Amino acid sequence: MSAANVPLEATWQGHVASTLDAVVLFEACLSGNLRHVPRRPHDRERQDLIQSGQIFIYEEHASGIKRWTDGVTWSPSRILGNYLIYRELERPFPPGEKKRAAKKNKKQTNGGISKSEGCLRQNTGMNGTATGANAANLSSAGSMDPSEASRNPERALIGSLVDSYPFKEGGLVKKTISVQFRSVPHHLVSYYTVQDVMSGALATPTSHSGFLRNIVPRPELILNQNFRAPIDEVDVDDNRLIQHPLSSAHQEYVNHMHPPTFRTWSVPHVNMAVANPRQWPTSMVPAQQQQMPPPQHAQYLQTHPGAMAAPMPPPNYAQPSTHHPYAYQDGVMRPQVTTSSTLAPDVYRNMLVDQPLSRRHSTAYDLSNSSHAIGLTQTMSNNPVDPIRNMSHPFMQATPVYGNSGRLQEPVQHSDAFPSPRTLPQQEPGLDGSQQHSASLKLEGEESHLQHNNSWGTYDVAATHDVFLGGTNTDQSQPFLNPEGEEEQYDENNPPPTWPPGSNNSMGRL
């Protein structure tokens, strides 16, 4: 038998008073406790199916229903919370006439509810006086405040559809709502009359004593919807909302998605003076620091001993150490440079050098028998040369080991590690009578010094290579050539720079 020949039945019978009632019915259909309707009612079925208390839920894709039709003449829709409501009209509108609301207010409508009476009931306080603010809210043609509707059950059933159109006396009210689950729209259509709901003939899903009482909607039906009003809207009875399992299920879902976290340590207030926390009074220590619950992962670490957890270190409130970048020495302020010798003077002396180390050093010269040791003379600080920095030290003479030792060549033996010293030509005095640029290189004992005289003073610089500072020697000079090889022309007042023989003056290098 095809679906068109199967008798159509309503999904449930009752009344949906709140968004929570509709969500419970949607969940019952998704879980298989209730069934979706596969099609719209036929013309012959409308008289029996479109009755007060009938609720139909259909899936848009599976049923192919784009628009629900029931053959009843309805008024324009109005918003009531998350629902759209319609009221049955006494007669349909003439063809081509717009569905305009009546301008003048009638004392009694065909539906049995007067707008003036409804406003009076809505805005009447405990002392019988009316408030103008509430009356202004109720006069809007759109949605009505759910809190106001909870105090007036009649207004909660029809919203603002009071006397705007020629409503049918004792006619039906249609209430619709839609949700999306996994990108599939699901629609609910409910029919009721004001008299049946007011008399208590129609029950709600949340107050049902049967299987619907234990239906808990899934979080997607609540959190992933574009509802105008929140799910805990005020038009739901507080007792029903608290007793329904949704309240506890929603709280468990929130706790699961956003678990509470604990701070392992806390810092003092921004206005509090930073000092040692041990010196703080008990009243000034934050409460979270005085009493802290155990971490949540403690039980996991006990169960899994192999798991590692790096605790967060407490803040360091100690005063930072003061560093002096300059120090007085020999009556002159000199910058204090931190080296490895100043940090740990005994590190290198305590190292074991019995066995050869796999370090790569130059073996071009054998300095074991040479009196000239390579090292930097610390003339600035007047400190003795560290023995470990001497190339004749056994630590520096360790044999390098890289793979096969047979491939290494024997070091070249030289009688003298450096050529004989030479004296640089003396420069002529400058215009002011001082030696502007004069330098001489000489070797004295085991140290090689470069004595440099200028207008500011004389100082010694340790030298291990030939150094030449340009001057104005006219005896051994060469003309300055530009990169093209041409001789530069200078006037008599501005003589050209000269270079010693053998130097590459075209590149301007020493």
Swiss-Prot record:
The keyword Nucleus applies. Its main location: nucleus. Keywords: Nucleus, Transcription, Transcription regulation, Virulence. InterPro entries: Gti1/Pac2. Residues 94-152, 393-438, 469-510 are annotated as: Disordered. One of its GO terms (molecular function) is DNA binding. It comes from the Eukaryota. It is found in: Nucleus. Signal peptide: none annotated. Disulfide bonds: none annotated. The keyword Transcription applies. GO terms for cellular component: nucleus. Residues 123-143 have a biased composition (Low complexity). Residues 471-480, 501-510 have a biased composition (Polar residues). Belongs to the MIT1/WOR1 family. Global transcriptional regulator of pathogenicity. Differentially regulates expression of effector genes. Also required for radial growth and production of asexual conidiospores, and plays a role in mycelium pigmentation. Not required for induction of Ave1, the effector that activates resistance mediated by the Ve1 immune receptor in tomato. PANTHER family: TRANSCRIPTIONAL REGULATOR MIT1. This is Global transcription regulator sge1. The gene is sge1.
